[in-house]
UniProtKB/Swiss-Prot annotation:
This is 3-octaprenyl-4-hydroxybenzoate carboxy-lyase. The active site is at D287 (proton donor). Prenylated FMN binds at I175, Y176, R177, R189, W190, L191, R194, G195. Gene3D superfamilies: Single helix bin, UbiD C-terminal domain-like. One of its GO terms (molecular function) is metal ion binding.
Length: 495
């Protein structure tokens, strides 16, 4: 699936019945959240609010409200194809040298994809068709959603934040929520381990007292947005990976006020800086956990320029108790994670982040167990291999006869294959999401691993149970006889 920008992607969605235009006046204050939430929970389309109350700019919501649309945004026709995206990332993360001519020929498609990686720099771009600067900068022109009744202020939710550290050639792209503080000020809520925060910290150390340049793109194309939330190798830029997903190079343009490069087709771009030491209390906000989070201090982003396309569209979302868009994206990106993990741990059969676990707080892993203690090694690997799992609080490891995506199977394994004392791993004083109010200290808490695998002789002195299973010949005979028995009125009833 090929598209060039967000508008092109919306046209594709509309052709497939995946976009609903809403002409009625809808208020960005709470009403859009309620409509988007009901639509997402019903598996409905992306929503384009054409007449937000009090604004002339349309609002796009629920863009990634189904796993199918996430896959479409990554250039694939269905979610299962995202495994191929994961295989490509695994290859780029740790490329294997060709073993011979035939192997080289087999790898040529991957090398061809890499050709789409470099960005294409433009001298002028659609995102700079209209420009406001200085006193003309006014964020109140943008219909920023106020999502929940007790939220502190309107919140920019899909801000693709572009930064560059003082010692880095490539830029970092990250999605960080931003509280509207005034007509030209936002609060940049980035956690200390995230790329933007690390760039800022390095800048402060290298350039004490100097302003840190920042740009925020709103309404970038889906490939660029999704690249920013995908486990891209540290040596690969998100723009480059977006080019791979899209099938052609990412087009960028230099900001008007600094040297950062932004997506050329973005609907809106905010340019500005962070003054060192300029902090403000952020929150509370309803977040993806289903609760309002605590108030904490974060840097203030001062906007000096707003550039945008003609007839710009504001891309927004809400976060709340799962399912929400982050949870749906987690389900889709789950398929990307599996090949990356399997590259490092070939014994992994499946890996699942249940959306009801707030996208990343609980993981279920199934493995081909090969030795005593194997499950514990896998737990440690999950927590340490990808930074995306740094905040995963619970890891459940099961054998490959268990379906990681079926709670009936997983709960059966936990309750029949675990001894709570022997098979529970507790690790204290580990990094935890700052939004996790259950941890005893903000940003620091514990992790739990559950070994729900069959135990080997070295792990237990007792005879281990054998699962009950019907004789296959008997099953075949009853299969042939089943319809004739007519036990259920519906012949297609589950057996």
């Amino acid at each position: 699936m090929k598209y060039r920008d967000l508008r092109d992607f919306l046209s594709l969605l509309e052709q497939r019945g995946e976009l609903k235009r809403i002409s009625q006046p809808i208020d960005p204050y709470l009403e859009m959240t309620e409509i988007a939430d009901r639509t997402l929970r019903a598996g409905g389309p992306a929503l384009l609010f054409e007449n937000p109350k009090g604004y002339s700019m349309p609002v796009l919501c629920n863009l990634f409200g189904t796993a199918k649309r996430v896959a479409m945004g990554m250039g694939q026709e269905d979610v299962s194809a995202l495994r191929d995206v994961g295989k490509l990332l695994a290859f780029l993360k740790e490329p294997d040298p060709p073993k011979g001519f035939r192997d080289l020929f087999d790898k040529l498609p991957k090398f061809k994809q890499v050709l789409n990686m470099p960005t294409k720099r433009l001298n002028s771009a659609p995102c700079q068709e209209q420009v406001w600067q200085g006193e003309d900068v006014d964020l109140s022109r943008i219909p920023v959603m106020h999502c929940w009744p007790e939220d502190a202020a309107p919140l920019v939710s899909w801000g693709l934040t572009i930064t560059r550290g003082p010692h880095k050639e490539r830029q970092n792209l990250g999605i960080y929520r931003q509280q509207v503080l005034g007509k030209n000020k936002l609060i940049m809520r980035w956690l200390s381990h995230r790329g933007g925060a690390l760039d800022y910290q390095e800048w402060c150390e290298a350039h004490p007292g100097e302003r840190f340049p920042v740009a925020v793109a709103l309404g970038a194309d889906p490939a660029t947005i999704l690249a920013a939330v995908t486990p891209v190798p540290d040596t690969l830029s998100e723009y480059a990976f977006a080019g791979l997903l899209r099938g052609h190079k990412t087009e960028v343009v230099k900001c008007l006020s600094n040297d950062l490069e932004v997506p050329a087709s973005a609907e809106i771009v905010l340019e500005g800086y962070i003054e060192q030491g300029d902090m403000a209390p952020e929150g509370p906000y309803g977040d993806h956990t289903g609760y309002y989070n605590e108030i904490d201090n974060f840097p203030v982003f001062t906007v000096t320029h707003i550039t945008q396309r003609q007839d710009a569209i504001y891309h927004s979302t809400y976060t709340g108790r799962p399912p929400d868009e982050p949870a749906v994206m987690g389900v889709a990106l789950n398929e990307v994670f599996v090949p990356i993990l399997q590259k490092q741990f070939p014994e992994i059969v499946d890996f699942y982040l249940p959306p009801e676990g707030c996208s990343y707080r609980l993981a279920v892993v199934t493995i081909k167990k090969q030795y005593a203690g194997h499950a514990k090694r896998v737990m440690m690997g999950v927590w340490s291999f990808l930074r995306q799992f740094m905040y995963t609080k619970f890891v459940i490891v099961c054998d490959d006869d268990i379906n990681a995506r079926d709670w009936n199977d997983v709960i059966w394994a936990i309750t029949t294959r675990m001894d709570p004392s022997r098979d529970t791993v507790l690790i204290e004083n580990t990094p935890i999401d700052y939004l996790d109010f259950a941890s005893p200290v903000s940003g620091l808490g514990s992790k739990m691993g559950l070994d729900a695998t069959n135990k080997w002789p070295a792990e237990t002195p007792r005879e281990w149970g054998r699962p009950i299973k019907m004789d296959e010949d008997v099953r075949a005979r009853i299969d042939a006889l089943w319809d004739e028995l007519a036990i259920f009125s519906d012949k297609d009833a589950k057996r």
